[in-house]
Amino acid sequence: FNLVGALTVFSSEYRSRHDAKYIPSAWDNRFVANISGTYDFSRGWSVGAKLSAIGGTPYTPYDVDKSSLVEAWNASGRPYYDYSKYNTGRLDAFAQLDVRVDKVFYFRKCMLGIYVDLQNVTFSKLRQPDVLMSTGVIENPSAPPSEQRYKMKYIRQASGTLVPTLGVTVEF
């Protein structure tokens, strides 16, 4: 049986000018943690697992007011960031559990190993900032063109699925 763990705690910030306040950098997750272990059974079987966790990433929120203006949206086709709030948002932390089962066969001049590896068995979802989108519907069509606004909506972004892998190893 073996068990290994690592924890890294950090802060990554910078200033745009020497007299400015510190701002979190894009990779300021605050922590990264990993714990992994394996257990060897008889007859060439082994089971391993790894738990990984990482703190939330900072992000810059959108300028919803500017983005909803019809003229602004039509000029860029995408939302505008609110750079006065640069990296003030922070996503949730993320963790996932991976599990692997191995079976080894020994022959006179070689070893054959087969394994099943399941990544993210907990189906954890890695969040990204929600995307601000125009619905294409103008909420105030009778307003002057410079004041017309699109109705906006957020699209949630999250990914996370079980990733199975079957493998074969051969050693001579």
Residue map of PLM features:
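Extracellular loop and loop/strand-boundary signature of outer-membrane beta-barrel proteins
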Residues: 16-24, 84-88, 151-155
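Residues embedded in well-ordered secondary-structure elements
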Residues: 26, 38, 88-90, 105, ...
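C-terminal beta-signal and adjacent terminal beta-strands/loops
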Residues: 53-76, 92-96, 103-172
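Compositionally biased, intrinsically disordered low-complexity regions enriched
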Residues: 78-84, 89, 134
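Active-site/pore-lining binding-face segments in mid-to-C-terminal subdomains
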Residues: 87, 97-99
